[in-house]
Swiss-Prot record:
GO BP, one annotated term: signal transduction
Primary role: May regulate the activity of kinases.
GO cellular component: a single term: nucleus
Gene name of the encoded protein: MOB3A
UniProt keyword list: Metal-binding, Zinc
Protein name: MOB kinase activator 3A
Signal sequence coordinates: none
Superkingdom: Eukaryota
Length: 217
């Protein structure tokens, strides 16, 4: 594998930040293997995201959220040297879309931030969610919280914004690395998954609507 971008994205030992893994022998580890096997076999991505017979939706969603977090994290990591306070003073997706940060700690009101600052806060926030046993339980038999899908929708909507920013503001870097096809595959996988289970509002998908229509339909 000569492409340096691919080495980073698919090398399991190289991560932008600590990677959440599934414990061998657990139900979710088996689901993770099943999902990866479908992708590696070249199965149509629309089919690959469908819930396998006999599996629980929350388990399937949890596995994919962690996987998407890891992949999007790495994609952003490869272009992050060109995403600076100066180049991207506002987290946006072109002139029409500005993304403001809000959380339960320092930023209780939607706040305009630079893209790198927004990304930092976002990745930290998602990491806290997926490592919280009360939200993403790892033990089989431990129930998911009632608001699990609500939390997931927020995570995935915010991860989608990373795709928006990367495609609109940093695609030249992706092209320079010769990695368009591989980033596009990650995006298609993500898009098919969130639309299969209705995990992102249509209005959130609007910034990449034209590209998605060409790529995913």
């Amino acid at each position: 594998m000569s492409n340096p971008f691919l080495k980073q994205v698919f090398n399991k030992d190289k991560t932008f930040r600590p990677k959440r893994k599934f414990e061998p022998g657990t139900q979710r580890f088996e689901l993770h293997k099943k999902a990866q096997a479908s992708l590696n076999a070249g199965l149509d991505l629309k089919l690959a995201v469908q819930l396998p017979a006999g599996e629980e939706l929350n388990d399937w969603v949890a596995v994919h959220v962690v996987d998407f977090f890891n992949r999007v994290n790495l994609i952003y990591g490869t272009i992050s040297d060109g995403c600076t306070e100066r180049s991207c003073p506002i987290m946006s997706g072109g002139p029409k879309y500005e993304y403001r940060w809000q959380d339960e700690n320092k930023f209780r009101r939607p706040t305009a931030l630079s893209a790198p600052r927004y990304m930092d806060l976002l990745m930290d926030w998602i990491e806290v969610q997926i490592n919280n046993e009360d939200v993403f339980p790892t033990n089989v038999g431990t129930p998911f919280p009632k608001n699990f899908l609500q939390v997931v929708k927020k995570i995935l909507s915010r991860l989608f914004r990373v795709f928006v920013h990367v495609y609109i503001h940093h695609f030249d870097r992706i092209a320079q690395l010769g990695s368009e096809a591989h980033v596009n595959t990650c995006y298609k996988h993500f898009y098919y998954f969130v639309t299969e289970f209705g995990l992102i509002d249509t209005k959130e998908l609007e910034p990449l609507k034209e590209m998605t229509a060409r790529m995913c339909h």
